[in-house]
Amino acid sequence: MKLKTITAFFAITWAVSTTVSAQKVSIYSTTSTERWVEKKQTLDKKTAGQADICVYPDSLLQNVVGFGGTFNELSWDALQCLSPAERDKVMAALFSEEGIHFALGRTPIGASDYAMGYYSYNDVKDDYTMRNFSIDRDRYILIPYIKEALKLPPDLKMWASPWTPPAWMKVNEHYSQKSSGIEGTEVGHNRLDPHRNLIGNVTGFKMQQGYLQAYAIYFSKYVQAYKQNGINIQMIMPQNEIAWTPCWPSCTWRPEDLAIFVNQYLGPQFEKDSIDTEIWMGTVNYPNPDYVRTFFKQKDSDKYVKGVGVQWTGMRALPAVHKEYPDYCYMQTENMCGNSENDWSALENTWNAVVHCFNNGVDSYIYWNMVLNETCKSWWDWAQNTLIIVDRKTGQVRYTDEYYLMKHLSHFVQPGSRLLKVSDDKNTLAFRSHDGKVVVVAYNPEEQERPCSFKVGSKYIRVILKGKSINTIVI
């Protein structure tokens, strides 16, 4: 009897050992010439010597809310050059389970710099009760764009922010902060008299009570109007790029004044109208953490604000801000715009930003323009980067390197995933996915391929990382 028990024990042990050692791992690799190459590889029994990178699957860090992209008018305009079938393919590449599978979407409240010109939802001067508020323009452009995305992941979470209030609410009564005549090579032609420029540490909004209350109603009506059109705005940030003064739609806010608007007007208005849309502080594009510190020092700043949104130029503030205010959620709100490089260097910049942001507390990451035409230009003539380029003349669709970077991340790292601790936090990120798998994303910045051994808990695998490659290993 004892002999049979021992024999059975060794048989079971051998079977388990064989199963573990034979476990297949999925590896996906992308270079500038070979995109999304998939292969299967067997786990090693043990790696010789110490592993190059250790992943600690039991060291769970922040929850991941997800990755996303931004809906802009010029993106939808570019998509109209495609046949319905080709347009569906592009949308699927961004939002379906087989594509990037974005979980989040950002949309502007009124005109962004990638709108087809300036507009707001109420340009009737001194309409403090918002009787003339209307989102009619969005019903033809942004709302159809968003609804096409919602056909794929119906639980896509949307958030929004304005680039500018209606011009009549601003001190210079213009949608921008600066005349395009002094912008060097940028030719937005905004027709702003340079004497009306708003530059420096100023608030561009008229801080009188009537304007503040009207603007709070403006936000409330926006959220309600979008809900009536089938789009739930789950979070808003009161201003895009709080501390920048460009020649396109913009409005600067001193932190003390932004706190007054949020704490005394916007938050109470949402309460009055029974709106459960979250209010976040942002988007912060100031690299000095003092902006956030000053905001949170104001009375009642912790009453309504649920999180902090940091734009790429404000990423340097993240380490200090997250350490000092650990109880808030953090989002990277806008990926680096670039200058239409749309090449591997753009991928590297974005990868470095993703690593920095997740290692400093963000739980969500938003790319900027998902689709642009072949010029990649904004209405104000700045050519920027994108995930997908549509050539209006040929109908050709090009997927850029950054598209594949986003796919290497978001395709596997969905809401409910957790960031994991790793021994090399410069070129490696690891997550425990929502379905329990470990997802390791590793970048090889060298020109030459290199072998790299990974230890994930008690599991080992040795992978050849191609030169200049982004890789996802699913264990």
Segments (PLM) and residue ranges:
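Solvent-exposed loop/turn segments at secondary-structure junctions
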Residues: 72-77, 111-114, 164-168, 240-245, ...
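Carbohydrate-binding surface patches
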Residues: 422-457, 462-464, 468
